[in-house]
Amino acid sequence: MEKTLLFAAIFLCVKADEICIGYLSNNSTDKVDTIIENNVTVTSSVELVETEHTGSFCSINGKQPISLGDCSFAGWILGNPMCDELIGKTSWSYIVEKPNPTNGICYPGTLESEEELRLKFSGVLEFNKFEVFTSNGWGAVNSGVGVTAACKFGGSNSFFRNMVWLIHQSGTYPVIKRTFNNTKGRDVLIVWGIHHPATLTEHQDLYKKDSSYVAVGSETYNRRFTPEINTRPRVNGQAGRMTFYWKIVKPGESITFESNGAFLAPRYAFEIVSVGNGKLFRSELNIESCSTKCQTEIGGINTNKSFHNVHRNTIGDCPKYVNVKSLKLATGPRNVPAIASRGLFGAIAGFIEGGWPGLINGWYGFQHRNEEGTGIAADKESTQKAIDQITSKVNNIVDRMNTNFESVQHEFSEIEERINQLSKHVDDSVVDIWSYNAQLLVLLENEKTLDLHDSNVRNLHEKVRRMLKDNAKDEGNGCFTFYHKCDNKCIERVRNGTYDHKEFEEESKINRQEIEGVKLDSSGNVYKILSIYSCIASSLVLAALIMGFMFWACSNGSCRCTICI
């Protein structure tokens, strides 16, 4: 009888239909960090930091940059005759200048506040160059022979294309005066200069007087310049120097020039047609036939990642720069390998015993076994809900760090090294803060994502438990054993949430009572065996005590045994 009960119990356990809830497991080696754990293996993750670039300058949104070639920014603005190839360039997405161009200010000198002009002009996307004063429109001065061997063109002496070097005419240099009225309706950049001869004799030869001045005035500007005559070392064959100045003339504003010598007069000015988020890069990189939406100093970036680690000096639609090379955001659940052996008869197990490598198109799902066989399927509803949440999380990470910041690195010359150092220090501080915030944000989000996956699996398990009610037994490992027959149609109802426990309530009740009865009967037989064993053991102990007493009594004469025949 005991053997029959035991086999019946085994038969019931093996043959019962079963459904389990679990999650994906795969061969991924992706590791992420959380706020409390490092190197957590997950089934999938997203790299948030872009490190790849084109290694060249590219057009932005179809608009080409302008390369100054062998010309410097100052040489371009003043019109170095060796920069004539740039004359037709009036529109660009950004400007590229070599670190050490050969064609700068050919006659030795400086462009005052060049760094500020670079910064202003880096945002200019288009200008219109026009003749502000004709070369011979300055009256009784000579405007045609102001050339120098320092600015040669085609083997002949020349001068800056956008300027006119006015000298005496027939031994006289009267006071000259001209006014420009800005009626363009846009800002106009105008440049002028003053010549500083090396000797008084040179000054007298050129301007026929011992002293001279240049006065410039407008509604917002008023300065008077005089030549600084001094002996200097020769540069490019010249002991003299030239200093150039500039002014942005607003619409409706007028600017007046007055001089009696040493005047470098403006000939062409720049009407600023379009201003935007431009940039001036200093780099040896070439401009290639490529397109990008984000350009850095060392190459273009085409990415949809949230951050980049290419270079902080950028233009375009760029992700935020951080000083870390990798930030991985977990998307899938923890990658816990499945237990190799599930026991007899191809047994299945739930999420407590590890993930499922066979789960396709989902993070969570069901595995079942019945008379029709075994099967596995993803729960698309809970998976899609999790995908939507995590996708939204990835898309919103940058929005949490939406502080506007633009680096001005490399837009200052060596003369302004202190400004460079201060700018770099500010840039470094801001980037450090952003990088720390990004790392902390990813750690927190990874922790929340893994908790989300754990919660989703448990919620799915709880959903099935509430659906099945007393029609199945919760095995405690993520699986349920049915008290009724559950074919594939029945299994599918459990998966899609249309299972009706009342339909199988009566069958489940009968089978549950039978199983519980078998357990109870089996338990009764065990108790019976234990009772018999206890009785026999007690009898043996009692007999041993009686025999011991008799031996003791006989040995001391208290008891006598007489045998009669």
Swiss-Prot record:
It is found in: Virion membrane; Host apical cell membrane. InterPro entries: Capsid_hemagglutn, Hemagglutn_HA1_a/b_dom_sf, Hemagglutn_influenz_A, Hemagglutn_influenz_A/B. GO terms for cellular component: host cell plasma membrane; membrane; viral envelope; virion membrane. It holds the Pfam family Hemagglutinin. Residues 17-531 are extracellular. The keyword Transmembrane applies. Residues 553-565 are cytoplasmic. One of its GO terms (molecular function) is host cell surface receptor binding. It is a single-pass type I membrane protein. A lipid is attached at C554, C561, C564 (S-palmitoyl cysteine). It comes from the Viruses. Palmitoylated. In natural infection, inactive HA is matured into HA1 and HA2 outside the cell by one or more trypsin-like, arginine-specific endoprotease secreted by the bronchial epithelial cells. One identified protease that may be involved in this process is secreted in lungs by club cells. Disulfide bonds join C20-C479, C58-C290, C71-C83, C106-C151, C294-C318, C486-C490. Keywords: Clathrin- and caveolin-independent endocytosis of virus by host, Clathrin-mediated endocytosis of virus by host, Disulfide bond, Fusion of virus membrane with host endosomal membrane, Fusion of virus membrane with host membrane, Glycoprotein, Hemagglutinin, Host cell membrane, Host membrane, Host-virus interaction, Lipoprotein, Membrane, Palmitate, Signal, Transmembrane, Transmembrane helix, Viral attachment to host cell, Viral envelope protein, Viral penetration into host cytoplasm, Virion, Virus endocytosis by host, Virus entry into host cell. One of its GO terms (biological process) is fusion of virus membrane with host plasma membrane. Glycans are attached at N26, N27, N39, N181, N304, N496. Homotrimer of disulfide-linked HA1-HA2. Belongs to the influenza viruses hemagglutinin family. Binds to sialic acid-containing receptors on the cell surface, bringing about the attachment of the virus particle to the cell. This attachment induces virion internalization of about two third of the virus particles through clathrin-dependent endocytosis and about one third through a clathrin- and caveolin-independent pathway. Plays a major role in the determination of host range restriction and virulence. Class I viral fusion protein. Binds to sialic acid-containing receptors on the cell surface, bringing about the attachment of the virus particle to the cell. This attachment induces virion internalization either through clathrin-dependent endocytosis or through clathrin- and caveolin-independent pathway. Plays a major role in the determination of host range restriction and virulence. Class I viral fusion protein. Responsible for penetration of the virus into the cell cytoplasm by mediating the fusion of the membrane of the endocytosed virus particle with the endosomal membrane. Major glycoprotein, comprises over 80% of the envelope proteins present in virus particle. The extent of infection into host organism is determined by HA. Influenza viruses bud from the apical surface of polarized epithelial cells (e.g. bronchial epithelial cells) into lumen of lungs and are therefore usually pneumotropic. The reason is that HA is cleaved by tryptase clara which is restricted to lungs. However, HAs of H5 and H7 pantropic avian viruses subtypes can be cleaved by furin and subtilisin-type enzymes, allowing the virus to grow in other organs than lungs. This is Hemagglutinin. It comes from Influenza A virus (strain A/Duck/England/1/1956 H11N6). The gene is HA.
